[in-house]
Amino acid sequence: MDKTDVKLLKLVQDGIPITHSPFKGFASELGISEQEVVDRLKNLQKAGKIRRFAASIGHRAIGITANAMCVWNVPDEQIETVGNIMAEFPEVTHCYERPRYPDWPYNLFTMVHSYTPEDCEKVAVRISEATGIRDYTLFFSEREFKKTGVRL
């Protein structure tokens, strides 16, 4: 990854314009051709530097206003299997293993999004049934101060 790739990533992280020539402005700013922009983006995607290109949906604007961080006490020897099962649920947007602490037994964290808090609770029940994990707690968000992806 060279300096031009880094500059290109900084440009596209704010979104790609919906126009007939979406990469023209990037090419102009970088002093390269549109085809080189496309080629570089393809190479960055192949190298795993860009996961995918997709629309970013404002979930609150379409009515998905409830979200809960679910914390799960998963036996260490089951963490891989259980984590993979939880990650398959479409309502789960994040699934992370984290360390346990003396007064905190939970080691797997998921973010569940749905239309209502009750729907989030139902998703947690389905996850519990699918994994056999019964020791869990949900924390519902009350207010969002910031939400963004990683920025360069």
From Swiss-Prot:
Its EC number is 4.1.1.111. The keyword Lyase applies. One of its GO terms (molecular function) is lyase activity. It comes from the Archaea. Belongs to the Ahb/Nir family. PANTHER family: SIROHEME DECARBOXYLASE NIRL SUBUNIT (PTHR43413:SF1), TRANSCRIPTIONAL REGULATOR, ASNC FAMILY (PTHR43413). This is Siroheme decarboxylase beta subunit. The lineage of its organism: Archaea, Methanobacteriati, Methanobacteriota, Stenosarchaea group, Methanomicrobia.
